[in-house]
Amino acid sequence: MAVAVPPGRAAGSGWAWRPVARDALLARAFHSCTELRGRFYLVGGLLAGGAREPSSDTVVFDPARGQAVRLGARGSPPRSHHDAAPVDGRWLCVVGGWDGSRRLATVTALDTERGVWEAWTGTPGDCPPAGLSSHTCTRISDRELQVAGREGGIHTQRRYGSIYTLRLDPSARTYCYKQEGCHTASRSGHCAALLQTPGPHPGHQLLLFGGCNLAEPEVAGHWSHGKIKEEPPVAPHLMEQLARLVSSGQGSQKGPHGLRHHSCSVVGPFAVLFGGETLTRARDTICNDLYIYDTRTSPPLWFHFPCADRGMKRMGHRTCLWNDQLYLVGGFGEDGRTASPQVCILDFI
């Protein structure tokens, strides 16, 4: 178990990744991992570092039983560096990514009731990105996603990031991209967090972290009170534990500099980031640090909790929130080539 207790701190102010399952089916990186009806759906990814061809399989992990099975649904798309989101509690929509030959902006959906993959089609008014990989898709309603990332094909990449609203219609099996009027910094391998804004004028904002040589988060969208209908998972115990951990640390207004291919999960007022690859070093680039972005204060504060266990270095992994626990799934380890078959939960000591 990877344990990290800050020097001079007592028990109760440390954290650990505690292994709860291990299966070779889960060993992958740059995959998507999406919770839907109490199951984690892992789609695609790279099975080894340096691989050019992404996996085309879908693995379902049952966190209650600690068991993984390969889904037999036909038509599972080969994808890596994509993102995915649940829709209407039934469909798993995979957006963009690398298929082994090009970057895509298409939507492919798994009907979890019928066990069938479907290629959805763009509507006549659709204005899709040129191509997406290492982007983010954030639910802002049950049928709307906010897509953020750098567009481009194999040979050309934009010098800025684009923001799209992606509307999904499961009954018609269609989707429609609408480009928003603003741009962001050129980011790839970043993460996104939809967080409530405190203060006298509450609302929501979408923040982008990392994916470029910057430390500051960037606002990619802002909604006034009542506009966002998306209800985040309730995790009161985990939120309490994170608050206790933060109270043992020293906050800073500066976040991690030049981090990419890390994970991010929103737990109440906290964005919890882990691992990733740093752009600030030529060697030993894969990280095992825990960062917590606390929005309860104004301005929000960063808290950094290092980990001494090099075996927990990860990049291209995912974290997933379920049943008041934060799960860590997959990713390449310290060598940047070997995918982890472990599932861990964030524990506190």
Swiss-Prot record:
It comes from the Eukaryota. Keywords: Kelch repeat, Repeat. The keyword Repeat applies. GO terms for molecular function: cyclin binding. Kelch repeats lie at residues 39-89, 91-137, 325-349. InterPro entries: Gal_Oxase/kelch_b-propeller, Kelch-typ_b-propeller, KLDC9. Gene3D superfamilies: Kelch-type beta propeller. Pfam families: Kelch_KLHDC2_KLHL20_DRC7. The keyword Repeat applies. Interacts with CCNA1. This is Kelch domain-containing protein 9. It comes from Homo sapiens (Human).
